[in-house]
């Protein structure tokens, strides 16, 4: 009995004491590659948490210009903590430099040579996330200016101790609170891991408390990190799906948003206003288009405060999102084959499952962009569907590139919903979104009986828009993002946008739309009222966020200088962009707005176009029909025999005919509208 008691006392004394573990010395190569200096940790409590965990990291590094260096700590579960990146100016060396969460002086405000105690750029307490302390930790060092001078790691050590700094304590918030428990696991890129979520929102004007029950939703989810470049940032964005007790995805409404299973927590790390995405989606919604609904919230993961996030709807087919028909592998003919499809121009990363190249190069001479499958994905589409959607897009591009592209019937207009393309252009050019036409550029196609055209949108991904990018002219008030000039970039803008602007119909219509919107929802008064109201809602939580992530007044890729040191400063910076960019577009957006009344009373010759051509079962007729007027249609075969005859009312200049299963070959379509006649030819497979 006494021996057991003595052993327990010895073990508890051992655990209660600080313990340090060191790495070996070694060269820091001058090659721009991360070099790992492993630290083997053993004999500690299995779980690193607020009772016993990582307390400090001390390093000794020699290098003639330490501002060349990026230094991180990588935990056994893959969590990466930024210690110091590109700090120190022209000074040298880190000598007996120790990082503590509790020190007031931040390393990025210090001067080289660095010695003594500093607060790291990240937070050490994020390592104490209930992961197993025992294992291999890595000090990662990269010389970001290769080919100049090398350095040397003279040793480093990690100290684990009782009661380390446990982070920021969130007690209550005016925003919804999200608690996530991953059961001690790190959150990977892929696949999703199981977790449990509590979403708390007590309603307008009510405070939400960290101890409240999850009254909006409480239950299992699958969660992963998401994004491309954003995966490298300290504050991660997450994708998650809501699951039932058996692990199957299940649709659930969240904080006033329609029921669905797939959602996103956007970290908004580079956008310190937390508003650039939201402003863009708000504008799209005000213009009558679908864009992701959003709600700001504060998140705690495994007991650790993570800051402000934006809960977003993921772009997805569905009645509450992109409202197009469900396309199944069985839909291989007739109207069922014609929709719905979601496509995009985007990076070839992440969950890309195929696509096809544009038929024509971009106007700047760069690489030809690809059109990628989003819904259904390339693994689900069957050959007939792939052939159909590719041929439709090819027909659109051929019509747009052709010499008669401005023609109402022979050009591109029958293939696209023009007004959706105009709204997409306006939103992305107002924001001068340098990614907007070449990355995360979504469009979709409806079934023929629902219009059948290519609809541009939803708009997506504006973190580095609205003047928040210091490259490719993203912070320059003048110019257009669809005239992207960087030919060395792997992702280019399709030729569509330049060509569309060469059509007076399109540019004049876009100009009229802009002028109309500037008198209302896009006026400075309306936009500033929205921005100010959102900033007021976020004001309490932003203070906590920027203690957790102390990046105000600090460069974060790709913020342009100067870097405002207050939240009010970054909000004013956004409003300045709105003022200056809108003024520039007022003066420079192409086109002339011709009042509708000037076109009234003109006699228009009857013209008609049949598409698609070749046709399958359904045929659309587009013509200069009077709205609601009765149009008589006859279809003849090559022998002159009448195969089909009926009268239909015209709607928006279009008529859908379903002639049935007649012989294949060339068909002549005769159209009568009042005392005017016209014909069209179509080949039917």
Predicted regions and their residues:
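Internal "kinase-insert"/substrate-recognition segments embedded within catalytic cores
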Residues: 180, 241-247, 253, 258-267, ...
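Conserved NTP-binding catalytic cores of kinases and kinase-like/nucleotidyltransferase enzymes
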Residues: 166-274, 279
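Residue-level detector of functionally pivotal "anchor" positions at catalytic/ligand-binding pockets or at interdomain
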Residues: 165-167, 587-611, 626
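Middle-to-C-terminal accessory/interaction subdomains
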Residues: 173-176, 185-188, 193, 227-229, ...
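Residue-level detector of buried hydrophobic side-chain packing
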Residues: 71-73, 139, 158, 180, ...
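Bacterial Sec-dependent N-terminal signal peptides
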Residues: 1-22, 598, 620, 666
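C-terminal outer-membrane/trafficking sorting elements
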Residues: 4-7, 602-611, 615-685
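Loop and turn regions of beta-sandwich accessory domains that flank beta-strands and are enriched
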Residues: 19-167
């Amino acid at each position: 009995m006494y021996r057991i008691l003595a052993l327990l006392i010895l073990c508890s004394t051992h655990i209660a004491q600080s313990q340090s573990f060191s790495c070996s010395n070694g060269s820091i190569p001058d090659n721009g590659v991360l070099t790992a200096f492993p630290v083997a940790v053993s004999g500690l409590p299995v779980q690193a948490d607020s009772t016993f965990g990582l307390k400090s990291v001390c390093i000794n590094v020699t290098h003639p210009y330490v501002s060349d260096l990026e230094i991180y700590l990588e935990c056994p579960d893959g969590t990466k903590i930024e210690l110091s990146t590109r700090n120190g100016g022209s000074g040298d060396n880190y000598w007996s430099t120790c990082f503590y969460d509790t020190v007031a002086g931040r390393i990025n405000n210090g001067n080289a040579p660095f010695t003594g105690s500093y607060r790291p750029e990240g937070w050490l307490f994020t390592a104490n996330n209930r992961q197993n302390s025992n294992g291999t930790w890595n000090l990662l060092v990269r010389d970001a200016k290769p080919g100049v001078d090398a350095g040397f790691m003279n040793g480093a050590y990690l100290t684990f101790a009782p009661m380390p700094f446990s982070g920021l304590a969130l007690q209550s918030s005016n925003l919804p609170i999200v608690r996530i428990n991953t059961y001690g696991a790190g959150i990977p890129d892929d696949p999703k891991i199981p977790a449990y979520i509590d979403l708390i929102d007590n309603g307008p004007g009510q405070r939400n408390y960290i101890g409240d029950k999850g009254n909006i939703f409480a239950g299992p989810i699958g969660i992963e990190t998401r994004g491309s470049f954003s995966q490298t940032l300290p504050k991660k964005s997450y994708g998650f799906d809501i699951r039932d007790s058996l692990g199957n995805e299940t649709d659930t409404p969240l904080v006033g948003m329609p029921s669905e299973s797939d959602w996103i927590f956007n970290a908004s790390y580079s956008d310190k206003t937390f508003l650039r995405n939201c402003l863009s989606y708000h504008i799209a919604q005000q213009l009558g288009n679908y864009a992701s609904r959003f709600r700001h919230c504060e998140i705690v993961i495994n007991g650790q405060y993570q800051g402000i996030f934006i809960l977003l709807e993921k772009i997805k087919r569905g009645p509450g999102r992109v409202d197009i028909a469900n396309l199944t592998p069985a839909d291989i003919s007739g109207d069922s084959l014609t929709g719905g499809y979601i496509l995009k121009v985007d990076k070839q990363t992440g969950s890309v499952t195929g696509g096809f190249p544009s038929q024509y190069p971009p106007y700047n001479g760069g690489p030809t962009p690809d059109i990628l499958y989003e819904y259904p994905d390339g693994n689900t589409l069957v050959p007939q569907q792939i052939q159909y959607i590719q041929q439709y897009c090819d027909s659109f591009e051929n019509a747009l590139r052709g010499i008669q592209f401005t023609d109402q019937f022979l050009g591109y207009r029958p293939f696209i919903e023009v007004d959706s393309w105009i709204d997409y252009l306006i939103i992305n050019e107002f924001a001068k979104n340098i990614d907007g036409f070449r990355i995360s550029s979504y469009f979709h196609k409806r079934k023929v009986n629902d219009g059948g055209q290519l609809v541009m949108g939803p708009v997506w991904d504006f973190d580095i828009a609205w003047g928040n990018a210091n490259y490719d002219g993203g912070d320059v008030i003048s110019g257009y993002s669809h005239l992207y000039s960087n030919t060395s970039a792997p992702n280019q803008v399709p030729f569509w946008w330049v060509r569309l602007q060469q059509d007076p119909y399109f540019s004049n219509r876009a100009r009229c739309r802009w002028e109309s919107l500037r008198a209302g929802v896009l006026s400075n008064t309306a936009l500033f009222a929205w921005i100010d109201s959102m900033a007021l809602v976020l004001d309490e939580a932003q203070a906590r966020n920027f203690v957790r992530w102390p990046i105000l007044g600090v460069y974060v890729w790709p913020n342009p200088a100067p870097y405002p040191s207050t939240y009010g400063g970054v909000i004013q910076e956004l409003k300045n962009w709105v003022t200056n960019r809108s003024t520039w577009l007022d003066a420079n957006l192409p086109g002339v707005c011709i009042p509708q009344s000037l076109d009234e009373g003109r006699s228009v010759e009857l013209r008609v176009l049949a598409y698609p051509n070749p046709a399958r079962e359904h045929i659309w007729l587009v013509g200069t029909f009077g709205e609601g007027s009765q149009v008589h249609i006859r279809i003849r075969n090559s022998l002159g025999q009448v195969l089909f005859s009926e009268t239909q009312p015209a709607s928006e200049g279009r008529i859908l005919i379903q002639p049935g299963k007649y012989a294949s070959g060339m068909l002549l379509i005769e159209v009568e509208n009042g005392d005017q006649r016209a014909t069209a030819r179509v080949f039917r497979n």
